[in-house]
Amino acid sequence: MAGALACAIPASASTAALGQNLIVNGDAEAGAGSQDGGAVVVPGWSVSGGLTSVNYGASGGFPAPGDAGPQNRGKNFFAGGVDTPASRAVQVIDLSAYSGAINGGHSQFDLSGWLGGYSTQSDNASLTAVFRDKNGNALFSQSLAPVGVGDRGGLTGLVFRDSHGLIPVGAALVDIVLDMRRTEGSYNDGYADNLSFSVAAVPEPGSWAMLGAGLLMLGFATRKRRPSAFGAHPAA
């Protein structure tokens, strides 16, 4: 991913809020979307292979505003592009603002997005987070599985995917990689929208224990107060 380093987005101390989406232009709204599926500039991403952003309802059978997809969608979504078997967009996020928690083993990530395709064709999109150390060495990667034709019910649209896990100790950067793959037809109909990557704190073991104990006590108290299923018999 060395060629994408110029797109690194620093999560500075002032913006290192836990739970905040760190992907820039993850919703394809920064910039004008294409009205016919053609190539346009995609701000915030290092793009190869023709990946583009397209208006919902663009001519040519692209997803319409009423098709399956995010409820809070904007005007645009990502698409694979014209006459290309594979296209890619990469964004590199600097995790240095979280280094203390990450290196203490106290950080987890959430990766999510809406992925999809066209009609009964098998073109698809995938989203991957590749964690690297300060020297650029890959430590760990996690991907959202592509949405297949069956997942979409053979209809044009997008389906939500989500994954989370621990951020590896030593991680200083994360590459966010959006891949679009064409399997048939001339247009690469891998689609994606509302992509998100966020960092959260790992709950302390004591917090889980206290929560579990509280739930057990609540259940015990509830059982003690529960009346008999047959009701009480009045005294003779």
Regions found by a protein language model. Give the residues of each.
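Activation segment
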Residues: 32, 212, 219-220
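Short, threonine-centered small-residue motifs that mark membrane-proximal processing/anchoring sites
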Residues: 2, 7-20, 195-215
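Aromatic (Trp/Tyr/Phe) and Gly/Pro-enriched flexible surface segments
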Residues: 16-116, 124-133, 138-169, 173-200
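C-terminal membrane-anchoring or membrane-association module
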Residues: 219-236
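Long, contiguous interaction/targeting segments characteristic
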Residues: 1-2, 42
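Extracytoplasmic/lumenal soluble domains of exported proteins with redox or metal-associated functions
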Residues: 5, 138-145, 231-236
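Residue-level micro-sites within transmembrane alpha helices that shape
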Residues: 90, 203, 222-223
